[in-house]
């Protein structure tokens, strides 16, 4: 719900809410620095201003420190904005911060949190993560999806060639490609309505991002009734159920897909019947995992490609350098596989630098299971934690000239995004690091290499480099505020 509407509703019920706040509010034991807060809304007013929350929370951290207390409505929250604080939460005290906090959007759209992303830290989560890492999205399985990825990239290249010389919505076309890869990897075949499913997922993600009134005032049943988006989310969930139930039933009947082996849904069906599985896998659990794959896989991958192209267009020398590398390494080849990505060292640095500046998960949500301390500050049990990965990736303590796109920095200092370097955590770290990291990365690197290999790019008439620099919007995958439109020209040497 729009923040201005949120303010109006909160003011209308201020008297009622204040009485609840007096009962519910607990002050931390330590005297943490915190911004001035207002009655009823706490620090919500600091998150109004048109910028994504990670930008605004960085401003708070600069003034009040890397472990900052913010009160969002009646909910006590802590924002971590340094590599040291993130390391405490995601390594030193990892089990204590391995929980996710509940929200209206996640509970409705992620099937009562019966998934991997938003599931509580319990036996169900451990089981699903193990299945995901060892069976569903293992490096071996990611390689087996190679022919699907290549076919969808070839479709993308054809679309670009047909549009040569005219502006193309690159963001939209890359998003379709990513969604179709995920769809075919999940269901083992081209689905009749996979385009509709992709659009439905995008719409669902946009609607489910952010906090509802009930999230900010959990003790108020009245505000829950006034959360109109709650009803919209439930309608969207019913639409998603209808589509996914149809696809799953069709899959049960057809069984074998284009793999000739198991696709993601096949594995989940097999595990559902496995008598050795300790915790039964429900139909909602299967649908939740599929929605996970779309939301954290397809959307995050396509968003990263869009950001990479934007940064390269704003830096022509970097564009020339990476295209020269790609065209030399892939000369004469009709397809590209994961093994060949190892040769493209500068292009991989371009991807890393894009992930540093524009992490797919800019704010990483956690929740403390027990009371503890981080950097000397007391954290009560069941405190909501927001780790600002976006801010950490731009911290001048760790990065020289942090707001500048400079892929060469990764040639100078070895840093990876596998959760070992806490100044660079685009996929999180610890036990809850993104389990689909390898799948998502393949869906970024290979399509980006092909787009750089086949085409020269320029801006549409009337656009300047400055038009490409836009802040992201609130959302699970840090999406851009505006789509990227570019004009492709087939590379002359081809």
Swiss-Prot record:
Belongs to the cytochrome P450 family. This is Cytochrome P450 71D94. Its main location: endoplasmic reticulum. It comes from the Eukaryota. It is found in: Endoplasmic reticulum membrane. Its cofactor is heme. GO terms for molecular function: heme binding; iron ion binding; monooxygenase activity; oxidoreductase activity, acting on paired donors, with incorporation or reduction of molecular oxygen. Heme binds at residue 434. The keyword Iron applies. Cytochrome P450 oxygenase of undefined substrate. Not active with limonene, (+)- or (-)-piperitone, (-)-isopiperitone, piperitenone or (+)-pulegone. Gene3D superfamilies: Cytochrome P450 (1.10.630.10). Keywords: Endoplasmic reticulum, Heme, Iron, Membrane, Metal-binding, Monooxygenase, NADP, Oxidoreductase, Signal-anchor, Transmembrane, Transmembrane helix. InterPro entries: CYP450_71D, Cyt_P450, Cyt_P450_CS, Cyt_P450_E_grp-I, Cyt_P450_sf. The chain crosses the membrane at residues 1-21. GO terms for cellular component: endoplasmic reticulum membrane. The gene is CYP71D94. It is a single-pass type II membrane protein.
